[in-house]
Amino acid sequence: MRTRFAPSPTGFLHVGGARTALFCHLQARHVGGTTVLRIEDTDRERSNQALVDAILDGLHWLGLDPDEGPLFQSDHTQRHTDMALKLLEEGKAYKCYCTKQELDDMRAAQQARKEKPRYDGRCRHRSEPPSDQPYVIRFKTPLEGEVVWPDMVQGTIHIANKELDDLILLRSDGSPTYNLAVVVDDHDMEITHVIRGEDHTSNTPRQIHLFQALGWDVPSYAHIPLLHGEDGSKLSKRHGAVSVLQFREEGFLASALNNYLVRMGWSHGEKEEFTMDEMVALFDVNNVGRSAAIFNTSKLLWLNGVHIRQSGPEQLRGELMWHLQRLGVDNPNPNFIDQIIPGMQERVKTMLEMAQMAMFYFKAPTEYAETAVAKHLHADILPAYAALLEKLHTVTADEWDNGGLERAFKVVMAETGAKMGKIGQPVRIAISGSDIAPGIYDILQLVGRHESLRRLEVLLSFFQQRVHGANG
């Protein structure tokens, strides 16, 4: 089996395209086949290298690197042209000299008769073609019968040939059209299975005709349902993030996005959570449903949190480091990253949230969250906090661990009568700037004795000024 993902570099890799790439990847991997990436860049005006790079980056982040490619459609223009000329020589195509005005008049007349606008084939049997007039080359679509194919998702599809007009193969400037290029490339790249969005279904009968006219084997087709927003309309930018790399920037894991996308049209019992290995083992495009899949960002966010909680530090390290560097942390130490991850996994739903929470490990807070200050820095707890800070100064570097810190806290709580919930939150605010942070003993150890005591002293000054200022 050879599948292909064939995006056009006229926009970023969006989630709909990513799901198609994922389905191609899974179907090929499931049977030990091969995936090919073909960049369909024949629209030279709208294609550019930056968008090609963005597509490659998106696929790489998702873990969907192809076995072959990227191959560029524009590299095979001469081959596409040769095949059109071959069909012309064999009488399976013809030169059409119709002017734009003629075509416009033809469509206007058809619309006036309430007919479907289509080319009427008037140049098929033109006896005296003008010698100096520009022309296109059109395919002679069969006039009778129908095209039938067993779609792996949609079931058997029948299209009457009378619904199809004579497809342009070469434009008047000699450039090949999309459908011709796709057929030639699919044949030359030995593609056996074409998995693509159902918006391509209308191209399939035309492409099947070309395969047959050229004497080539027709691949198997699977047209998967499109992604829709929660309002039922086709997914677009107005529904929020649609670019794969934008999801990364917002803190989603590739594993979670893949997991969510595979569930857009496919299921395996009641199971919601899948690893890539599980998807490869279980996925079959024949089991993809026909109805449109609704993209629900809230559900993706929930699933992302599940993947964060179930992943080991080594699985999250690279993504957290990427986000930290974007937030201004230079070259974070991987071993230190592995130590801080477990304390945050249960508290966040995105890797961006984790990176933002982790910033205090690298940079002391320059201000404190107003809600945390108002809630926890009260005059009645100031004496206990001051006593705790004094006690922590007596804890040596060798004792600065869970056991040593816990003993110091317990002594102060016994002496002052303060509860852990009361005395602990000011410590958390001092170290992290917020009352939402990992365990107190953990953050004191990870920030280190010297820096922790410095931050605790800074908060003491702030605390005293706040209390005395309020009383004064």
UniProtKB/Swiss-Prot annotation:
- Motif range ('KMSKS' region): 234-238
Cofactor binding summary note: Binds 1 zinc ion per subunit.
Q: Which residues form a coiled coil?
A: none
Q: What is its EC number?
A: 6.1.1.17
**Coordinates of motif 'HIGH' region in the sequence?**
7-17
Compartment(s) of residence: Cytoplasm
Q: Report what the protein is called.
A: Glutamate--tRNA ligase
Source species: Magnetococcus marinus (strain ATCC BAA-1437 / JCM 17883 / MC-1)
Gene that codes for this? gltX
